[in-house]
């Protein structure tokens, strides 16, 4: 059974009910909507289509809204055509938005472009395809020397590696998009270009103000500043997306894999979800099979301990969206089989919290008894994630009375969530847990299961692990 979850970006190729149903069958767990593209009518229809499929088939999936985020882009060029730049030539960026660009100058969207940069800084355009070095700053213009040949287009992203940028965490478009997400009841927001703790706090306050206090925030780490402030960002977030695309432009490409491993490790320790994203099966946008390197990359992220792996263009606009999900699911299943439990987490001398100690003990017991299932009663999802932290061989069945928690746990590795009407007592939980275990086919008659619970209210009081035979 596949334990690692798959996030699929849904676009024109995959938005129909028929395709969404096939994607769920193939292994999709979370639908990602990329708000850098599309309008509210399109995204609203995609959400409706997925909900229709779920209500017809009983399948479970969560919805993730990915913000455009505060970014710098090039503006207009003459005739809207790309211009060819040559290595060694001089090229100018201006903050005067009325300028129509050519092969010597282009306007950018960011007012503070001239004040944030200094001579000697690097400017990268279009995911780093064109590099330039700042040679002078004059008024509202930044004059650069072009470092390599390339074609510059309109609306292309501009990165300033190693430069601290004074952009707000939420652009005006993001604020409107988040309100739309609150109205639609999405489960997660993936917040782009998070640089510091206050960015996350600002987004959380905006969500709360519009009825989205239950929406979980997944912070995307895409630059050096985000890496430098990673610990404080993690503390303020519900999860992290390792956004390797922009990150690989902002920091040296050979550093990306080490940043990935560091972030995944810290997320596991903090019991926060982590998604590994970007270019995972990139060649499948055009080809029916991935490269061997891509297959290895997906497996490597899973071995690192990621909760989920993500498809972007592969499932949104590629030629082989279904094949991409199927192949990714196959790699997940194969790699999940060799993952061993990690009971040595917290070998540091830190004292365990009660919940963590009980959950660790439950995993250890399940391993020793070869139990196929650990059943957890959870209100907000923390207990289920505390069990997941130790990578049990057993599947984690999370029973919750909270519909939001049931959907959000869809993103956690190895967790199957089940919404139940009510749990009135510990005995009630044991009875319910056994019933669901058998009905779902996750365990058979005669199997040993470990059950984890606590005081029924309030949440956060897990204190009991017990062993039962079905």
Swiss-Prot record:
NCBIfam families: PRK05826.1, PRK06354.1, PRK09206.1, pyruv_kin. Its cofactor is Mg(2+); K(+). Its EC number is 2.7.1.40. This is Pyruvate kinase I. It catalyses: pyruvate + ATP = phosphoenolpyruvate + ADP + H(+). Belongs to the pyruvate kinase family. K(+) binds at residues 34, 36, 66-67. ATP binds at residues 34-37, 73, 156. GO terms for molecular function: ATP binding; kinase activity; magnesium ion binding; potassium ion binding; pyruvate kinase activity. Mg(2+) binds at residues 222, 246. Catalyzes the formation of pyruvate in the last step of glycolysis, it is irreversible under physiological conditions. The reaction is critical for the control of metabolic flux in the second part of glycolysis. It comes from the Bacteria. Pathway: Carbohydrate degradation; glycolysis; pyruvate from D-glyceraldehyde 3-phosphate: step 5/5. Substrate binds at residues 32, 220, 245-246, 278.
